[in-house]
Amino acid sequence: MPGGRISHIEFPADDMERAKRFYRAVAGWEPEPMEGFDDIEFFQTAHEEGGAIGRRGVGTGQVVRAYITVPSLETSLAAVEEHGGSVIEGATELPGMGRFAVVLDSEGSEVALWEDVAPAG
C-alpha cells in the first residue's frame, strides 16, 4: 500500500516578485493569488501536484516545506511524538479545504502533515 503522497510544497521568499520570476523561468510555474490568502501565491504542475511561493515567515515558514497527505491528522501527530519527532505548529483548519500541522521529524527536518476535508454528504 502506498504511503502518504506529497500534496504540495512551499518555497519561502524574501522577495516575492523575484522568486516568482525565477520559478516562472526555471520551472514554467505561474503562481497566482488565492482569495483569503495574503503573502502567498499558488501554482500547479503539469502532473497536478502544486505548491506555493510565499513571503518568508509570513505566508510560509522559514524553510522549504513539503506537505504530506495523511488519512488522520490526529493519528499521524501521535506517531510523530512516538517516533522521536515533535509538533511545532498544532492543527490548523483551512475551511472547506482541510487541516494541517507542522512537525519536526526524528532528524530535525520540518515537514507538514495535511488531512483533506471530508467530502460533504
Show where each model-derived region lies.
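Conserved catalytic-core motifs of GNAT/GCN5-like acyltransferases
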Residues: E10, E30-G36, E89-L94, V117-G121
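Conserved beta-strand positions that form and line the central face of beta-propeller blades
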Residues: H8, F42, A52, G90, ...
